[in-house]
């Protein structure tokens, strides 16, 4: 008889930066949760902010890692493409995408290399709402996990990945890319809300019905009630209905004499402030401003320098992941991260060159036909 061996279940991976749900209380929150909620609300309420961060994530590009040993490089490339990330994704690019968005939105990002079987078995993006960053001397930072109303230091800090965006001198807290935008965004949302209210009123017109009674004033109340009932019947009727009244009656649309304020100028002023802070060219966000076409190449160059700076923040994170995996696999931990070239300026030039070539070809065909 054939004997079937029971398949061994994989051991659960322990993530040290994730607090136990049973011990997690609402009161145990790290410093700055209100600020993080504000930045999340900004991304949810102002689509252009969320779109800009998504554009930066996609424009960041991909990278390759080179190692001295060919076998080590092949295995490392396979690991980077297939490593489990959080609960639903695979590949180091997925981990870096969440890590980068967290860094831009909150100013800090925390990740973890999860060990299993003596190897880096998974990568995990830690939520900043469940941890607290504390300085550990002038050159180090410590991470603690909130469990209820107490903090538990992470026992293996060498497996953690930490980054800060433009921290102030002597501080481990980074600066969010959205810092300074709440005030501007509040004004923009007020304008949009007012526009919605005004258009709702224009689409659902309210009327003022005025009836001047006889000088004697006899039966004025009865006539007013009867007129109100007839007007209500005429307005609520599903079919075309007439309103018949006797006497001096005037009907006016409420607000017909008012003029809706022009919102184009203030909305553009607020959007200019937001775009300037985010560093993304307006034409990438669907804003067709007159200066965009003339300055697209210069703006592409500026975005390239921004992306290079962001890559500089992520390169040490990638190197730490790769070196840890190589060391645990028994290989030389030396490796080098090489990003693909950001040539947005060249892409613009190439697009113009293709257009000119197509135009020249079209003219040549016309000359041949004649």
Regions found by a protein language model. Give the residues of each.
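Structured, contiguous alpha/beta core segments that scaffold functional sites
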Residues: 1-247, 254, 273, 357, ...
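Long amphipathic alpha-helical segments
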Residues: 135-163, 222-304, 308, 312-341, ...
């Amino acid at each position: 008889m054939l004997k079937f061996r029971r398949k061994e279940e994989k051991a659960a991976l322990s993530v040290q930066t994730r607090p136990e749900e049973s011990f997690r209380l609402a009161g145990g929150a790290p410093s700055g949760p209100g600020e993080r909620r504000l930045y999340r609300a900004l991304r949810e309420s102002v689509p252009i902010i969320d779109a800009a961060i998504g554009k930066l994530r996609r424009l960041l590009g991909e990278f390759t890692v080179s190692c001295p040993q060919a076998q080590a490089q092949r295995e490392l490339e396979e690991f980077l493409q297939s490593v489990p990330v959080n609960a639903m994704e695979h590949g180091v690019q997925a981990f870096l995408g969440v890590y980068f968005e967290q860094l831009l939105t909150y100013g800090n990002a925390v990740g973890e290399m999860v060990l299993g079987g003596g190897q880096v078995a998974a990568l995990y993006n830690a939520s900043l709402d469940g941890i607290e960053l504390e300085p550990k001397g002038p050159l180090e930072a410590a991470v603690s996990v909130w469990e209820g109303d107490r903090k538990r230091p992470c026992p293996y800090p060498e497996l953690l990945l930490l980054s800060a965006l433009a921290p102030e001198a002597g501080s481990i807290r980074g600066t969010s890319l959205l810092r300074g935008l709440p005030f501007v965004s509040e004004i923009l949302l007020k304008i949009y809300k007012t526009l919605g209210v005004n258009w709702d009123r224009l689409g659902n017109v309210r009327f003022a019905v005025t009836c001047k009674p006889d000088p004697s004033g006899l039966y004025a109340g009865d006539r007013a009630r009867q007129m109100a009932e007839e007007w209500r019947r005429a307005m609520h009727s599903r079919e075309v209905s007439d309103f018949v009244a006797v006497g001096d009656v005037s009907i006016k649309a409420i607000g017909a004499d008012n003029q809706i304020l022009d919102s184009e100028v203030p909305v553009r002023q607020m959007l200019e402030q937001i775009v300037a802070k985010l560093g993304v060219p307006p034409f990438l966000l669907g804003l067709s401003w007159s200066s965009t076409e003339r300055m697209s190449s210069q703006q592409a160059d500026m975005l390239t320098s921004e992306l290079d700076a962001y890559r500089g923040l992520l390169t040490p994170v990638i190197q730490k992941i790769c070196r840890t995996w190589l060391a645990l696999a028994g290989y030389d931990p030396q490796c080098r991260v090489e990003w693909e070239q950001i040539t947005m300026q060249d892409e613009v030039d190439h697009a113009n060159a293709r257009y000119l070539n197509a135009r020249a070809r079209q003219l040549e065909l016309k000359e041949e036909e004649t």
